[in-house]
Amino acid sequence: NVVFAFWDGEEIGLLGSKYFVQTCPFIPQIKGYLNFDMIGRNNKPENPQHVVYFYTEAHPAFGQWLKDDIKRYGLRLDPNYRPWDKPVGGSDNGSFARKDIPIIWYHTDGHPDYHQPGDEADRINYDKVMNISRAAFLNVWNLANEKTF
């Protein structure tokens, strides 16, 4: 089974994701969690395919999956691979990582108009959003079909 869920209250203490992991009756069955933050921005104008790809270091297959899928499916992404095992930042993936649930987290770094009136839809790189979405679909496919964990 695949569960799609959306959280609220991230920036005031991860309220939604914390509540979910504290009350979810099937936490032991969760194989992984995908998180997306600001995936449509071009924060490196010289590299519009840039994306930061955090994943749980104890699961190196997560990094290899993306490398293989970029090559196999021609995804137009230039990932900065960042394996890690300690929750960082204030994003919802931390709620899951603290429960020892492996995570994959797509991010495109900060930008000058973060939380500002100028943060408008015309600044979104829709090609990047599409390629990250395709990669995420393949992540979910791999997670759902992975037998080793």
Language model feature labels by segment:
Residues 7-108:
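Metal-dependent peptidase/peptidase-like ectodomains
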